[in-house]
């Protein structure tokens, strides 16, 4: 929903995709057998990148529903189509969110944000306690990256070196 409020969605998408690439390179170095090839940041970055070109809530709703139902078709994707779907049959990965079906949820959220279903939440927050609760959302990319590093560090301490 917040992508509909952004003043610079392409810049934000590029930032997310940059960190997605860093995650891929980092996991390739430390976990070469299970590295992230197309994870949640790749998915969100791609969705953010294409979202400015889809302005109609109705079209976005149709795309979201179509992508969702497309995921139920028994299609065999080749290994090179990993970002689209079916990569789990070829590779072991720590994090995998293919475009089908996960992009459907992005488009459904985009459609609802464009329809202003959440218009009540567009009001400025004046309560200091609420502002504090909204703070993690403002820095969600940093929160996501840091929590991943903390979890991996704890797992390495408990289970030992990944190699």
Task: Identify the residue ranges that each predicted region occupies.
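Alpha-helical transmembrane segments and their immediate juxtamembrane cytosolic regions
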Residues: 1-163
């Amino acid at each position: 929903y917040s992508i509909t409020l952004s003043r610079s969605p392409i810049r934000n998408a590029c930032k997310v995709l940059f960190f997605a690439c860093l995650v891929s390179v980092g996991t390739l170095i430390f976990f070469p057998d299970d590295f992230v090839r197309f994870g949640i940041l790749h998915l969100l970055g791609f969705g953010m990148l294409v979202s400015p070109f889809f302005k109609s809530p109705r079209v976005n709703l149709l795309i979201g529903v179509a992508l969702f139902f497309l995921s139920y078709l028994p299609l065999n994707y080749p290994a090179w189509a990993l970002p689209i779907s079916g990569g789990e049959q070829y590779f072991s990965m720590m994090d995998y969110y293919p475009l089908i079906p996960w992009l459907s949820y992005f488009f459904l959220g985009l459609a609802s944000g464009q329809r202003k279903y959440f218009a009540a939440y567009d009001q400025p927050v004046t309560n200091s306690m609420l502002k504090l609760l909204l703070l993690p959302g403002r820095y969600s990319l940093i929160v996501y990256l840091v929590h991943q590093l903390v979890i991996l560090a704890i797992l390495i301490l408990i289970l030992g070196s990944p190699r």
